[in-house]
């Protein structure tokens, strides 16, 4: 889970890397934190998309008359 501390730490490491540079340990930590962060964001996006997809599906069955689609078929 993304916490405030995690974001603060990512920012801290980023700024330190821009100013004085990071130790090997800090570089590893930064890489881990970023991977965790990206993974979490992707999960959130996936959940969002799924909930949107389900919302759209339920709309199709909300009682509208779909017979008007049939005039496109040639007999």
UniProtKB/Swiss-Prot annotation:
Classification via Pfam families: DUF896
Gene Ontology cellular-component terms listed: cytoplasm
Main location: cytoplasm
Subcellular location: Cytoplasm
Gene3D superfamilies attached to this UniProt entry: Helix hairpin bin
Keyword Transcription: no
Keywords from the named record: Cytoplasm
Residue spans crossing the bilayer: none
Family note: Belongs to the UPF0291 family.
Name recorded for this polypeptide: UPF0291 protein Teth39_0326
Species assigned in the record: Thermoanaerobacter pseudethanolicus (strain ATCC 33223 / 39E) (Clostridium thermohydrosulfuricum)
């Amino acid at each position: 889970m993304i916490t405030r501390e995690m974001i603060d730490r990512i920012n801290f490491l980023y700024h330190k890397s821009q100013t004085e540079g990071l130790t090997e340990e800090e570089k590893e930590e930064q890489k881990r934190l970023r991977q965790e962060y990206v993974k979490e964001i992707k999960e959130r996006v996936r959940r969002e998309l799924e909930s949107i997809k389900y919302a759209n599906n339920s709309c199709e069955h909300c009682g509208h008359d779909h017979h008007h689609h049939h005039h496109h078929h040639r007999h």
